[in-house]
Design a protein with these regions (language model features):
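Cytosolic, long alpha-helical scaffolding segments
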Residues: 1-207
Length: 207
């Protein structure tokens, strides 16, 4: 676990997750200072971050294609780096959906869901920051549990918010937009949970 080649993958996973933090912070800023006039510019800024994250993903895959003996199973590296890439992709979708569905305001439900997403993305980075030392670090399982708990919280919020929206609103376009937004939010938390579970599976196989 000490060679530079081994360190590359674990460090790269952290770098991928840090792009998700940058995007989620940008999206939070969009929510907190919501202005439809500036939305296209914000979308471009988020896309630039996502594109840079894509480059890191391709860098990992290129190195793996030339690697003789990777530190963990090749298939596990592929799955984990793809999940991390998916996370940045799904986060990028948030401002795109705001634009596509002409969302006029950010309500409390969206802010509350975004807070859970923010926590989950930060926990993913904390998890991956200790992943390279998984045989010694005792905090790793705490992060996995935390991410799973946040996903469960997201499920509860999703069902509560969707029930409320369909009970109170009757405009079809608004309902479609809200459903797409909340489904995307839930998908982001599901992906974070998939990352945590994949890390847990890798640890089990290598312990």
């Amino acid at each position: 676990m000490a060679s530079k080649s081994n360190d590359f993958y674990f460090n790269a996973f952290v770098e991928q997750s840090e792009f998700s933090i940058q995007i989620v912070e940008k999206v939070k800023n969009i929510f907190e200072n919501y202005n439809t006039i500036n939305l296209r510019t914000s979308m471009d800024e988020v896309h630039l971050l996502e594109h840079t994250a894509d480059i890191k993903h391709h860098e990992i895959m290129e190195k793996l294609s030339k690697e003789f003996i990777p530190p963990i199973e090749r298939e596990d590296i592929v799955v984990l780096t793809q999940l991390l890439d998916d996370l940045t992709d799904y986060l990028e979708d948030i401002p795109i959906l705001l634009y596509t569905y002409h969302v006029k305001t950010i309500d409390q439900a969206m802010m509350q869901f975004m807070d859970v997403i923010d926590q989950s993305v930060h926990q993913v980075t904390k998890l991956l920051s200790v992943f390279g030392d998984f045989k010694k670090d005792l905090t790793i399982h705490k992060y996995i549990i935390d991410i799973n708990r946040l996903e469960e919280n997201g499920d509860i919020l999703f069902h509560e918010f969707m029930y409320k929206v369909f009970e109170e609103e009757h405009d079809a376009r608004y309902l479609i937009g809200q459903k797409e937004m909340f489904t995307k939010f839930e998908g982001i938390l599901d992906t974070a949970e998939d990352i945590a579970n994949e890390v847990g599976n890798i640890i089990m196989k290598n312990s």
